[in-house]
Regions:
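Enrichment for repetitive, rod-forming helical segments
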Residues: 24, 49, 74-77, 86
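Short, mixed-charge aromatic SLiMs
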Residues: 62-77
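Long, leucine- and charge-enriched amphipathic alpha-helices
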Residues: 9-61
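Long, charge-rich low-complexity segments
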Residues: 79-94
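Intrinsic disorder/low-complexity signal
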Residues: 5-9, 74
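Long, charge-dense, low-complexity tracts
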Residues: 2-5, 61
Length: 94
């Protein structure tokens, strides 16, 4: 990929993941708790949808297959989700 989010000359320095971790470790605990709760609830809903479509015993295999076959897309989506989560915490912190 183009490393769109990891420009070394970026004034914010760091990847979306590193910024997310900075926020998790340093922001208001309640705000971080709320965001992590939101993420877990979404992940649980997605797992349930996958179970309904593919069956409970195949969920892990389907996830691994997508991670392997669409690695670039998964990486980009993960970076976008880090950015969204950072934004959610920071906007609540104002």
């Amino acid at each position: 990929m183009y490393n769109l989010f990891e420009d070394e000359d970026d004034i914010f320095q760091g990847s979306p993941k590193s910024k997310f971790l900075d926020i998790v470790y340093n922001a208001n605990r309640d705000l971080v708790h709320n965001e992590l709760e939101r993420l877990m609830t979404r992940m649980a809903a997605m797992e349930l949808m996958l179970e309904e479509i593919h069956g409970e015993d195949k969920v892990e295999r389907v996830i691994q297959s997508v991670q392997f076959d669409r690695a670039d897309e998964v990486d980009m989506m993960a970076k976008n989700l880090y950015i969204i989560s950072v934004g959610n915490v920071l906007t609540q912190n104002e």
